[in-house]
A protein has these predicted regions:
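An accessory alpha-helical subdomain
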Residues: 121-136, 145-146
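Small/polar glycine-rich anion-binding or flexible loop at a beta-alpha turn
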Residues: 97-101, 126-128
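Active-site glycine-rich loop that binds ribose-phosphate moieties when present
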Residues: 101, 105-107
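N-terminal catalytic or cofactor-binding beta/alpha core of small enzyme domains
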Residues: 1-98, 109-118, 143, 147-179
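Short intrinsically disordered coil segments
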Residues: 139-141
């Protein structure tokens, strides 16, 4: 859910009940034209837009006594180099924003740390997608606030769903190889 509290609760339940071997969280960043492998989550919620619960958080720590940041433990660099090498639209990003995506990324690591679990975990921002197989230069119905990791614009780039799905599947494959 696009909710600070809801995402923390859902993550806590899933990580406790399922006990996965790896965690790969995804979020849409409208306006990006590449799949972004996020490298760092910071202990900060700060966006002047509401989440789905109507909550606005500005300059608030996610966990007041928590770490300042967590780094992805997914094989980000190796996946990026390999996928970029075959011409896929990927990038390494050093900011997951300060909205719910960053919150999810941070909370996943914090919860895993509290559970004493050291497993691969990270976050990937995907651009808006369209169902056909040709990239679109613009979609005028999509906008996103900069705090959410996107851009505010009347037209934003999109990628074909199949391309995004392939990139995410490849990152999962690379993660499973290093486990």
């Amino acid at each position: 859910p696009v909710s600070y509290a809801g995402s923390s609760e859902a993550l806590g339940e899933m990580l406790t009940d399922i006990r996965p071997d790896a965690v790969l969280s995804l979020g849409v960043a409208v306006g990006r034209d590449k799949v972004s492998f996020e490298k760092v989550a910071i202990n900060l919620d700060s966006a002047d837009i509401e989440d789905n619960d109507g909550v606005v958080r500005v300059d608030e720590a996610i966990a007041p006594e928590g770490r300042e940041a967590y780094f992805s433990t997914l094989p980000v660099r190796a996946s990026y180099e390999r996928l970029r090498g075959v011409g896929l639209p990927v990038e390494i990003s050093y900011t997951a924003g300060t909205y719910v995506c960053n919150h999810v990324f941070y909370e996943a690591h914090r919860i895993l740390e509290r559970q004493g679990r050291r497993i691969p975990a990270g976050f990937v921002h995907i651009p808006a997608t369209q169902p056909d197989h040709e990239p679109s230069d613009a979609q005028t119905t999509l906008t996103a606030h900069a705090d959410a990791g996107g851009v505010e614009s009347e037209s934003v780039p999109t990628l074909p769903e199949a391309v995004v799905a392939r990139i995410v599947a490849e990152l999962v494959r690379d993660t499973l190889k290093v486990m």
